[in-house]
Amino acid sequence: MAMSKPEQPAHTGSGPLFERRYWVDVQHPRQPADALLRHIERHLPDFSSDLLADFEKSKGTEGRLAVGDEYSIKILGPWNGDVRVTEVGTDFFELTTLESHPEAGRIRFSLRPHATLSDTVRFEIHSWARSRDGLVAFTYDTLGLGRRVQQQTWEVFCQRVADFSGGLLLGPVQVETIKEGEEVD
């Protein structure tokens, strides 16, 4: 059995740290937030565009999500990488990038009741990452190639969650990026 790759936390990367949030609010979903999140966990690849980021479970039991599970992701362009499930909670799960992934960091998927609207949930993807190395930083951030693919990937993911919920989408997918040391854009 092959040894697992080591994790690649943000402090091992290169360039500025980016905090990114993608979220969507859905009113009157057909199922409770916890049931919807469990479905996402069991069917993670179904919510990602396989043209942009094709998730394939490489370690762990199919049909469930547990700490230690790993996914290989084929990303549009020369961006393939692996991630490991590092946390699973009642309303979230978190993935950490592994060695050779184009980014160094972590990403959290959460589904919670909306803070102010009744019978409404917020699905959010929240990442904290920097580029793996200077070359990735240049092509990803300076040229913007990887960044556009990534944004489209997570917007599609949010949209598919909203569609699957069967509820009313309250506006388009929202995107927020904070570059280390800068204000929200």
Q: What residue ranges belong to the model's regions?
A:
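A conserved amphipathic terminal alpha-helix motif
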Residues: 130-184
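Hydrophobic ligand-binding cavity/cleft-lining segments
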Residues: 1-74
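Intrinsic-disorder/low-complexity, polar/charged segments enriched in Ser/Thr/Lys/Arg/Asp/Glu/Gln
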Residues: 17-23, 92, 120-122
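Short amphipathic alpha-helical segments, especially helix-boundary/capping motifs
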Residues: 13-14, 83-86, 134-135
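Beta-strand/loop substructures that line and gate deep hydrophobic ligand-binding cavities in soluble
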Residues: 100-148
